[in-house]
């Protein structure tokens, strides 16, 4: 049985993720504040971004771009883990 969390993306209570899906402090924050539905929406968007921009996940610069886009998508432009 999954936990219910307040999803900051959906702005309502929803089923949380089964396990952390991203490393580090950001991953912990995502696990605690992003629902399974919101994460699936991000995965769809992520696939589009990787394909359209021909991002290479072996390239650190491309991974940095994708992480920035993830933060904007899930939390908004002014998100900082330090402020939350």
From Swiss-Prot:
Record keywords: Iron
GO cellular component, one term: cytosol
GO biological process: cellular response to oxidative stress
Tagged with keyword Metal-binding: no
InterPro entries: Fe_traffick_prot_YggX (IPR007457), Fe_traffick_prot_YggX_sf (IPR036766)
Domain of life of the source: Bacteria
Gene Ontology molecular function: iron ion binding
Annotated Pfam families: Iron_traffic
Recorded family membership: Belongs to the Fe(2+)-trafficking protein family.
Main function: Could be a mediator in iron transactions between iron acquisition and iron-requiring processes, such as synthesis and/or repair of Fe-S clusters in biosynthetic enzymes.
Record's subunit section: Monomer.
Record's protein name: Probable Fe(2+)-trafficking protein
Species annotation: Blochmanniella pennsylvanica (strain BPEN)
């Amino acid at each position: 049985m999954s936990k219910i969390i307040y999803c900051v993306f959906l702005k309502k209570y929803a089923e949380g993720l089964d396990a952390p899906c991203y490393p580090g402090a950001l991953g912990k924050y995502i696990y605690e504040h992003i629902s399974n539905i919101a994460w699936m929406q991000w995965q769809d968007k992520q696939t589009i971004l990787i394909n359209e921009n021909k991002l290479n996940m072996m390239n650190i610069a491309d991974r940095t771009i994708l992480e920035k886009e993830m933060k904007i998508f899930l939390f908004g432009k002014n998100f900082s883990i330090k402020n939350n």
